[in-house]
């Protein structure tokens, strides 16, 4: 499975390089604006980082889905399913690499954001006092350790939620491409399947939340324990269903 993961990791190498170069340019531009005291330069680079973060995280997530669609569509890419490896190994490698890819890009943006934040505090010294006051207020309300734990918890829940979205995308593609392999409408069917599956998952979540409201008690966090448990279960269920369908339709 390690070789399969390396193979899948290489498929998105170009995208990662573009993101890394773009981030480096934005951060250097921002820090350059700090050094020469150019507010416009700092503002433009910060805006590009902010807007780009939404696009990049979204694209890097769906790119793995597009690659899976290509692997099931073109004859050359379809050959990966004819290797001696089991469908479970191939699909597992794709899932793991997709998750690692998202985490990698997320980590890059966190590092870039921290560098810009430190540079901004150096440039506007008095602003540091404002952030210190805000931080102290949060600490007084929840305690320093709890504040850090809440931030980590919320970020992890967001990561799990986005992972579930990508996995549902995988399932939608597998459903369309295994049933309508040679159909020109398979792409459109996969989009419809994605929204239908997502709608069903969210409906079930809402029903559970109404029946068991206590599982959604989140304290000072945005996400409750029920949210995390539910979507982890969904991720596992979607993987098993995707693997079962692929094994039935693609194994040789």
Per-range role (PLM):
Residues 1-76, 87-252:
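Hydrophobic alpha-helical transmembrane segments of membrane proteins
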């Amino acid at each position: 499975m390690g070789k399969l993961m390396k193979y899948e990791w290489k498929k998105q190498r170009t995208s990662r390089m573009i993101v890394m170069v773009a981030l480096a340019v934005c951060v250097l531009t921002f820090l350059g604006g700090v050094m020469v005291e150019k507010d416009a330069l700092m503002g433009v680079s910060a805006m590009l980082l902010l807007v780009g973060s939404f696009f990049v995280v979204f694209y890097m997530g769906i790119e793995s889905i597009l690659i899976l669609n290509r692997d099931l569509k073109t004859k050359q890419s379809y050959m990966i399913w004819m290797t001696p490896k089991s469908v479970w190994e191939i699909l597992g490698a794709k899932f793991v690499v997709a998750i690692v890819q998202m985490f990698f890009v997320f980590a890059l943006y966190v590092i870039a954001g921290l560098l810009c934040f430190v540079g901004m505090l150096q440039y506007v010294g008095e602003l540091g006092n404002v952030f210190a006051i805000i931080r102290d207020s949060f600490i007084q309300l929840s305690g320093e350790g709890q504040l850090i734990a809440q931030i980590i918890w919320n970020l992890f829940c967001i990561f799990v939620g986005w992972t579930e979205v990508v996995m549902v995308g995988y399932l939608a593609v597998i459903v369309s491409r295994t049933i309508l392999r040679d159909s020109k409408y398979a792409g459109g069917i996969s989009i419809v399947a994605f929204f239908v599956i997502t709608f069903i998952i969210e409906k079930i979540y809402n029903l559970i939340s109404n029946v068991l409201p206590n599982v959604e008690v989140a304290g000072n966090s945005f996400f409750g324990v029920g949210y995390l448990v539910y979507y982890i279960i969904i991720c596992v269920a979607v993987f098993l269903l995707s693997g079962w369908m692929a094994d039935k339709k693609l194994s040789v």
